[in-house]
């Protein structure tokens, strides 16, 4: 006989909310395999992969410009912390991944901030982590943005990430446009 007092305490679960945008999202069905607005639960030992290969990735993009495995998110627990954190690893040999203003090349990884902008090709992801108590599992939730996220969230404008992954130093080292006097031309 189970009573209310004997019932297990329900723990809240860490949720990684991902708002995504691609300029061709309405015409091409790029995100047709992603369930928007509903939460999906994963065990905390699972590495969640994103890419175009449905046999290897939990989340797939219907786009030949995306690598078979584009990037991976792995939960972990920081030393002396009671909540889950995430690290992101670029799995693409041909395209760099931008996390805020940090460029990740092939197999580079970093800890994911609580809120950050992730970009590759023409894809834009706004990732936001909501802490939970459980370290046994976590959830993901996708939201489709009707507008580019860089402008909508007042993030600094950045040059698009070229598909060959090679950046021009002109774009990566300049943070704002330079003003010139017309006599300097």
Curated annotation (Swiss-Prot):
Q: What does the comment on domains in this protein's record state?
A: The FHA domain recognizes and binds phosphorylated Thr-9, promoting homooligomerization and subsequent activation of NF-kappa-B.
Instruction: Quote the subunit structure annotation.
Output: Homooligomer; homooligomerizes following phosphorylation at Thr-9. Interacts with IRAK1, TRAF2 and TRAF6. Interacts with TIFAB; binding to TIFAB inhibits TRAF6 activation, possibly by inducing a conformational change in TIFA. Interacts with ZCCHC11; binding to ZCCHC11 suppresses the TRAF6-dependent activation of NF-kappa-B.
Task: Write out the PTM section of this UniProt entry.
Answer: Phosphorylated at Thr-9 following detection of ADP-D-glycero-beta-D-manno-heptose (ADP-Heptose) by ALPK1. Phosphorylation at Thr-9 by ALPK1 leads to the formation of an intermolecular binding between the FHA domain and phosphorylated Thr-9, promoting TIFA oligomerization and TIFA-mediated NF-kappa-B activation.
* Functional note: Adapter molecule that plays a key role in the activation of pro-inflammatory NF-kappa-B signaling following detection of bacterial pathogen-associated molecular pattern metabolites (PAMPs). Promotes activation of an innate immune response by inducing the oligomerization and polyubiquitination of TRAF6, which leads to the activation of TAK1 and IKK through a proteasome-independent mechanism.
**Pfam families for this protein:** FHA
- Domain FHA per the UniProt entry, residue ranges: 48-104
- Coiled coil stretches, renumbered: none
- From the Swiss-Prot or TrEMBL record, give the protein name: TRAF-interacting protein with FHA domain-containing protein A
The protein's matches in InterPro entries, at most eight in alphabetical order, are given as: FHA_dom (IPR000253), SMAD_FHA_dom_sf (IPR008984), TIFA (IPR033621)
Subcellular compartments = Cytoplasm
Which UniProt keywords are present, listed alphabetically? Cytoplasm, Immunity, Innate immunity, Phosphoprotein
Tell me which family the UniProt entry assigns to this protein.
Belongs to the TIFA family.
Instruction: Specify the domain of life of the species encoding this protein.
Output: Eukaryota
In-chain residues carrying the UniProt-annotated modification Phosphothreonine: 9
Keyword presence, DNA damage: no
**GO biological process, any:** innate immune response
Instruction: Answer yes or no on keyword Aminoacyl-tRNA synthetase.
Output: no
